[in-house]
């Protein structure tokens, strides 16, 4: 997950408060010495001989780790290219903005994919400080399968009502940004993508009433911004000191304020629905049925005999943003940019989309049959996945791999994704080919392995194994709804003079956040989405 935050040293964080230690009792450098000693002890206590034998690509000692973290954050792509050249088919270590990581080779993928001692959830909790106040809002969902069950039961194959709400919200967002004019409008692609994905997700997970409520949207954006910034800056501190440090960080204070505001809003929302339910029961009337994330969450907590309140409801929104929003936004932006750069392929995809919408309407069936659009999105994800290293894990118990590498409990691992551009697997792997997976899909077995939502050893864009992204089916539906509107009724192109470039932010390679596109509504729109569901 990408977080646009510069590295910050402990000394910079300390500027926000005053040390109350008498200068005649302790030297001024005493706190720094303590921090360094804690870091030394922690580093060596959590390492082992097998891991220390692996080559480091960006640091050789403890005292160079700060510079190594900053170098990684600014130019991780260059470091990864260097590592792949120096250590092909071998594991290696790297000091990242999140700490030390062991990078495993794709040859080990089948071996680790379902190992119960390698946990995705625990890695996520550690990276985002799940035990620290404010960040701990995610803990309920990390310790249970409620979110996974919600998605499996309600979003694997979205019903017509969900698709219609996604379509209505897409029309609302695009009209808000572009209006009905046929004049070209210059838009920041990152902002447009984030607004589309954020609002479409909110329409389904928080419901029709809240998804356009200004106070909710503002507090939600405020929370996620301060949460990401605070999470990143806490990684500048040795782990044993992070709990203490967070009390003095303005980002963490802002995060808690926004979290409290969200809980207040949701407390009223939960109480309103509860009162409606009780009133209907008392009057002997049929209960009003909701079909959104909060209704699904209430059902799942009830089945488990757990309380349902604003705290749990807020945690649901946090987890959705953490595990899905960034990756979906990233794929939408990259997919749009790839289509802009390949007008011939875009025209073929547009014709396919229009044909399906006219014959099948906007349905799960028509989305399944949009082979070219599906293929183009999967290709964008292959060429530039949301993270350059994927399949993050935390080792929960000592593990010895078949190559002899011993992973001690607490070790953090990533998987190299070089095989997604391996010429032995993909022809012309550096080239974006919209039809690549459509062709594979037409081959025997391709229907189950070459779709956007397919997870295979050769394409791990949504993860692999027991921790593969459960929400990938909903993400695919959301993307196809948004792009159906854009392809059918809008024209878009690069802004004049814009060079397409990519920026490294730690493990993520993003489209330049300043990139803009020109968009206008067609004089004669191809599809009337307001009536397509009436057929």
Q: What do the predicted segments below correspond to?
A:
Residues 1-23, 405, 507-535:
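C-terminal helix/juxtamembrane-tail motif
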């Amino acid at each position: 997950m990408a977080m646009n935050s510069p590295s910050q040293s402990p000394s910079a964080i300390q500027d926000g408060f005053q040390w109350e230690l008498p200068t005649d009792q302790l030297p001024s450098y005493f706190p720094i010495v303590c921090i360094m000693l804690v870091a030394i002890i922690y580093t060596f206590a959590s390492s082992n001989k097998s891991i220390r034998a692996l080559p480091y690509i960006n640091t050789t000692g403890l005292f160079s780790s700060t510079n190594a973290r900053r170098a990684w954050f600014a130019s991780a792509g260059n470091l990864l290219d260097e590592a792949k050249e120096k250590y092909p088919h071998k594991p290696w270590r790297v000091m990242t903005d999140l700490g030390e990581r062991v990078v495993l080779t794709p040859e080990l993928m089948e071996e680790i994919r379902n190992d119960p001692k390698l946990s995705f959830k625990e890695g996520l909790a550690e990276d985002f400080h799940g035990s620290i106040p404010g960040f701990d809002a995610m803990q309920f969902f990390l310790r249970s399968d409620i979110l996974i069950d919600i998605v499996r039961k309600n979003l694997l194959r979205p019903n017509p009502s969900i698709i219609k709400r996604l379509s209505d919200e897409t029309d609302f967002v695009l009209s808000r940004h572009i209006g009905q004019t046929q004049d070209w409008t210059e838009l920041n692609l990152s902002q447009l993508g984030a607004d589309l994905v954020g609002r479409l997700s909110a329409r389904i997970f928080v419901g029709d009433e809240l998804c356009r409520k200004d106070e909710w949207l503002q507090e939600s954006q405020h929370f996620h911004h301060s949460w990401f910034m605070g999470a990143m800056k806490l990684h500048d501190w040795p782990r044993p000191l992070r709990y203490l440090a967070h009390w003095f960080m303005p980002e963490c204070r802002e995060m808690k304020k926004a979290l409290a505001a969200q809980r207040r809003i949701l407390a009223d929302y939960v109480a309103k629905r509860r009162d409606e339910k009780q009133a209907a029961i008392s009057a002997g009337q049929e209960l009003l049925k909701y079909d959104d994330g909060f209704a699904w969450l209430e059902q799942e907590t009830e089945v488990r005999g757990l309380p349902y309140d604003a705290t749990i409801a807020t945690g649901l929104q946090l987890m959705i943003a953490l595990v899905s929003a960034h990756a979906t936004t990233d794929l939408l932006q990259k997919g749009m940019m790839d289509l802009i750069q390949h007008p011939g392929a875009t025209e073929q995809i547009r014709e396919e989309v229009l044909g399906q919408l006219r014959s099948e309407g906007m349905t799960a069936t028509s989305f399944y049959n949009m082979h070219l659009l599906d293929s183009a999105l999967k290709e964008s994800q292959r060429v530039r996945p949301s993270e350059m290293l994927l399949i993050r894990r935390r080792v929960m118990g000592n593990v010895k791999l078949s190559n002899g590498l011993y992973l001690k409990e607490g070790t953090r691992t990533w998987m190299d994704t070089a095989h997604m551009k391996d010429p032995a697997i993909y022809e012309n792997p550096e080239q974006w080919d919209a039809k690549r997976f459509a062709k594979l899909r037409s081959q025997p077995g391709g229907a189950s392995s070459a779709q956007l939502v397919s997870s295979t050893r050769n394409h791990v864009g949504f993860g692999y194994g027991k921790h593969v992204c459960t929400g990938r089916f909903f993400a695919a539906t959301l993307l196809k709804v948004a792009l159906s509107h854009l392809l059918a009724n809008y024209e878009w192109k690069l802004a004049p003079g814009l060079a397409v470039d990519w920026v490294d932010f730690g493990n993520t390679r993003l489209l330049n956040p300043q990139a803009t596109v020109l968009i206008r509504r067609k004089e004669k729109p191809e599809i009337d989405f307001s009536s397509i569901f009436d057929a």
